[in-house]
Structure formats: C-alpha cells, structure tokens
Amino acid sequence: MVYCKGDQLEREGDPARWMAFVESGCFKYVNRSSDDREHITWFSFVGEFVVDYPTFLYDRPSQTTIVAMMTSRILWLFYNFG
C-alpha cells in the first residue's frame, strides 16, 4: 500500500492491531504536548517495521500518531487478538 506525505497510518488512541514493513519512504512517530506542540519520538525507515510496539504487544490503544514523511510503500501485517 502507498501513503503520501502527511498521511496517517495510525492515530493516537486507535487500536494497534497491525504492523507493517517499510519497502520505501519513511515514517515519524508523533506525540502532542498539552500546549499542542508536536514531539517526534521515533522514525521507521526502509527495511524496518513501522509499529507502535508496546500497544501492539499488549493490545492497547495507540500512544502515538504515525505519519508518512514522504511517499512511502508498506506491506501490512494484521493480527486479531482474541
């Protein structure tokens, strides 16, 4: 699947039931502070997985928003808890 710059893979608070492999492009992991400033906490690049690991592993709502930094292609891997 292809994502354009600025497209969100996941929003903070969404269930995290997937991970993906980055074929091209890159992604940033963003959290917002109480004064609405953006804080980048991580990146995923070509050849890496893009996933909010703690929330994926423990089946919790996402703690971060994951955003494409450029046109990017990923391979999705889904998991059904339960």
Regions found by a protein language model. Give the residues of each.
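Cyclic-nucleotide recognition modules
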Residues: 40-82
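Short alpha-helix-to-loop micro-motif enriched in aromatics/charged/Gly
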Residues: 34-40
